[in-house]
């Protein structure tokens, strides 16, 4: 099981968010090849602006592993993490994040800011952009429907 497999699992989570009228972002956390947690955006459902897929996946992984640090774990997410989520990755000490679409408005990894490579922080998170057209298409479809008041 490689990057593409795990990103497709995250994409299934993003589709669940889409079906609920949430911004379609899905995330999973993997440790030693095992999926530890899965989540999708739940901001609308939970009425919580911090209920991003990454934040929920981090919380669940910490709970399951009974730790506040996710050393040796990787996050696979369908959209570049925002600034809040990027800093949460630093705080969680996760090893690496792999994302499949860029976020030109709110990206906290490479598109707008680069939190993960900030030299003044105590932890560096490796990152990789691994494009999956299906992730970008799902986001485009969602925002098109939102603009046309279909969602």
From Swiss-Prot:
Catalytically driven reaction(s): adenosine(34) in tRNA + H2O + H(+) = inosine(34) in tRNA + NH4(+)
Cofactor comment text: Binds 1 zinc ion per subunit.
Family indicated by similarity: Belongs to the cytidine and deoxycytidylate deaminase family.
Record's function text: Catalyzes the deamination of adenosine to inosine at the wobble position 34 of tRNA(Arg2).
Protein's name according to its UniProt entry: tRNA-specific adenosine deaminase
Cofactor: Zn(2+)
Subunit structure: Homodimer.
Catalytic site positions: 54 (proton donor)
Pfam families: MafB19-deam
Listed EC numbers: 3.5.4.33
Keyword annotations: Hydrolase, Metal-binding, tRNA processing, Zinc
InterPro entries: APOBEC/CMP_deaminase_Zn-bd, CMP_dCMP_dom, Cytidine_deaminase-like, tRNA_aden_deaminase
Occurrences of domain CMP/dCMP-type deaminase (ranges): 1-111
Taxon lineage: Bacteria, Pseudomonadati, Aquificota, Aquificia, Aquificales
Disulfide topology: none
Native species: Aquifex aeolicus (strain VF5)
One GO BP annotation of this record: tRNA wobble adenosine to inosine editing
GO MF term (any one): zinc ion binding
Chain residues that bind Zn(2+): 52, 82, 85
